[in-house]
Amino acid sequence: MNPATDLLKGLLSKLNSNKVCVGIIKSAKIDLSFFGFGVVIEGMSPITDEETAIIAILEKMKKNGKRLLITIDEVTNNEFMQVFAGSFQIFVRQDLPVFLLATGLYENIDELQNEKNLTFLYRASKIQLKPLNNRAIMNKYKTIFNII
Protein backbone atom coordinates (compact mmCIF):
# COMPACT_ATOMS: atom_id res chain seq x y z
CA MET A 1 0.00 0.00 0.00
CA ASN A 2 1.08 3.56 -0.58
CA PRO A 3 1.76 5.49 2.65
CA ALA A 4 1.14 8.81 0.89
CA THR A 5 -2.57 7.95 0.57
CA ASP A 6 -5.38 7.25 3.04
CA LEU A 7 -4.30 3.76 4.12
CA LEU A 8 -7.53 2.72 5.87
CA LYS A 9 -9.64 3.74 2.90
CA GLY A 10 -7.18 2.00 0.56
CA LEU A 11 -7.21 -1.17 2.66
CA LEU A 12 -10.99 -1.25 2.72
CA SER A 13 -11.09 -0.76 -1.04
CA LYS A 14 -8.56 -3.57 -1.60
CA LEU A 15 -10.51 -5.90 0.70
CA ASN A 16 -13.71 -5.10 -1.21
CA SER A 17 -12.05 -5.88 -4.55
CA ASN A 18 -10.51 -9.20 -3.43
CA LYS A 19 -12.57 -12.23 -4.53
CA VAL A 20 -12.16 -14.08 -1.22
CA CYS A 21 -12.98 -11.02 0.86
CA VAL A 22 -16.01 -10.07 -1.25
CA GLY A 23 -17.52 -13.46 -0.45
CA ILE A 24 -16.81 -12.94 3.24
CA ILE A 25 -18.30 -9.42 3.16
CA LYS A 26 -21.47 -10.67 1.45
CA SER A 27 -21.88 -13.72 3.70
CA ALA A 28 -21.39 -11.58 6.81
CA LYS A 29 -23.93 -9.06 5.47
CA ILE A 30 -21.49 -6.21 6.05
CA ASP A 31 -23.09 -3.11 4.50
CA LEU A 32 -20.36 -0.99 2.90
CA SER A 33 -22.73 1.11 0.77
CA PHE A 34 -21.68 4.24 2.69
CA PHE A 35 -18.23 3.91 1.07
CA GLY A 36 -19.64 3.57 -2.42
CA PHE A 37 -19.32 -0.17 -2.82
CA GLY A 38 -21.32 -3.20 -1.91
CA VAL A 39 -25.06 -3.40 -1.72
CA VAL A 40 -27.51 -2.15 0.84
CA ILE A 41 -28.65 -4.98 3.10
CA GLU A 42 -32.30 -4.70 4.13
CA GLY A 43 -32.67 -3.99 7.84
CA MET A 44 -28.95 -3.42 8.38
CA SER A 45 -27.37 -0.08 9.16
CA PRO A 46 -24.43 0.79 6.91
CA ILE A 47 -21.02 0.98 8.55
CA THR A 48 -19.82 4.57 8.32
CA ASP A 49 -16.13 4.46 9.24
CA GLU A 50 -13.30 2.50 7.69
CA GLU A 51 -11.81 1.13 10.91
CA THR A 52 -15.13 -0.39 12.01
CA ALA A 53 -15.68 -1.89 8.55
CA ILE A 54 -12.19 -3.41 8.50
CA ILE A 55 -12.68 -4.86 11.99
CA ALA A 56 -15.98 -6.45 10.89
CA ILE A 57 -14.28 -7.99 7.85
CA LEU A 58 -11.29 -9.23 9.89
CA GLU A 59 -13.59 -10.79 12.50
CA LYS A 60 -15.39 -12.71 9.76
CA MET A 61 -12.04 -13.67 8.18
CA LYS A 62 -10.93 -15.04 11.55
CA LYS A 63 -14.07 -17.19 11.77
CA ASN A 64 -13.28 -18.51 8.28
CA GLY A 65 -9.66 -19.32 9.15
CA LYS A 66 -8.28 -16.62 6.84
CA ARG A 67 -5.45 -14.19 7.57
CA LEU A 68 -4.46 -10.86 6.07
CA LEU A 69 -0.96 -9.63 5.26
CA ILE A 70 -0.71 -5.88 4.70
CA THR A 71 2.40 -4.63 2.92
CA ILE A 72 3.53 -1.02 2.95
CA ASP A 73 6.56 0.11 0.99
CA GLU A 74 8.57 3.18 2.01
CA VAL A 75 7.00 3.95 5.38
CA THR A 76 7.04 7.63 6.28
CA ASN A 77 5.87 9.48 9.35
CA ASN A 78 2.77 11.22 8.02
CA GLU A 79 -0.82 11.55 9.17
CA PHE A 80 -2.06 8.64 7.02
CA MET A 81 0.60 6.33 8.42
CA GLN A 82 -0.03 7.45 12.01
CA VAL A 83 -3.77 6.83 11.71
CA PHE A 84 -3.15 3.44 10.10
CA ALA A 85 -0.61 2.41 12.75
CA GLY A 86 -3.05 3.35 15.51
CA SER A 87 -5.77 1.27 13.87
CA PHE A 88 -3.37 -1.62 13.30
CA GLN A 89 -2.62 -1.58 17.03
CA ILE A 90 -6.36 -1.96 17.69
CA PHE A 91 -6.59 -4.87 15.22
CA VAL A 92 -3.71 -6.64 16.96
CA ARG A 93 -5.08 -5.93 20.44
CA GLN A 94 -8.38 -7.52 19.37
CA ASP A 95 -6.44 -10.62 18.25
CA LEU A 96 -7.55 -10.26 14.65
CA PRO A 97 -5.70 -12.26 11.95
CA VAL A 98 -3.76 -9.34 10.50
CA PHE A 99 -0.04 -8.97 9.89
CA LEU A 100 2.04 -6.05 8.66
CA LEU A 101 5.16 -6.10 6.50
CA ALA A 102 6.50 -2.57 6.18
CA THR A 103 9.71 -1.38 4.58
CA GLY A 104 11.41 1.95 4.71
CA LEU A 105 14.45 3.88 5.74
CA TYR A 106 15.49 3.36 9.33
CA GLU A 107 15.10 7.09 10.05
CA ASN A 108 11.49 7.11 8.81
CA ILE A 109 10.48 4.05 10.81
CA ASP A 110 12.27 5.38 13.89
CA GLU A 111 10.48 8.72 13.56
CA LEU A 112 7.11 6.97 13.26
CA GLN A 113 7.59 4.72 16.27
CA ASN A 114 8.70 7.71 18.36
CA GLU A 115 5.23 9.27 18.06
CA LYS A 116 3.87 9.30 21.61
CA ASN A 117 0.77 7.24 20.80
CA LEU A 118 2.60 4.73 18.57
CA THR A 119 5.30 3.44 20.89
CA PHE A 120 3.78 -0.06 20.61
CA LEU A 121 5.82 -0.26 17.40
CA TYR A 122 8.94 -0.64 19.56
CA ARG A 123 7.59 -4.01 20.70
CA ALA A 124 6.85 -5.18 17.16
CA SER A 125 9.17 -7.70 15.57
CA LYS A 126 11.68 -6.08 13.26
CA ILE A 127 14.26 -7.39 10.87
CA GLN A 128 16.89 -4.88 9.85
CA LEU A 129 18.43 -5.70 6.52
CA LYS A 130 21.84 -4.71 5.29
CA PRO A 131 22.23 -3.00 1.90
CA LEU A 132 22.21 -5.30 -1.12
CA ASN A 133 25.57 -6.48 -2.39
CA ASN A 134 25.96 -4.89 -5.84
CA ARG A 135 28.61 -7.38 -6.97
CA ALA A 136 26.40 -10.34 -6.01
CA ILE A 137 23.49 -8.81 -7.93
CA MET A 138 25.68 -8.22 -10.97
CA ASN A 139 26.98 -11.81 -10.91
CA LYS A 140 23.45 -13.19 -10.57
CA TYR A 141 22.26 -11.19 -13.59
CA LYS A 142 25.27 -12.43 -15.58
CA THR A 143 24.38 -16.02 -14.68
CA ILE A 144 20.67 -15.65 -15.42
CA PHE A 145 21.12 -13.89 -18.74
CA ASN A 146 24.25 -15.82 -19.80
CA ILE A 147 26.35 -12.68 -20.01
CA ILE A 148 30.08 -13.27 -20.20
Where are these regions (language model features)?
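Sensor-1/coupling segment of RecA-like P-loop NTPase cores
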Residues: 62-64, 68-71, 77-83, 87-118
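Alpha-helical scaffold elements adjacent to nucleotide-binding pockets in ATP/GTP-utilizing enzyme cores
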Residues: 3-14, 83-87, 111, 120, ...
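Generic structural signal for well-ordered alpha-helical scaffold segments
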Residues: 55-59, 89, 142
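Conserved small helical "lid"/interfacial subdomain of P-loop NTPases
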Residues: 129-148
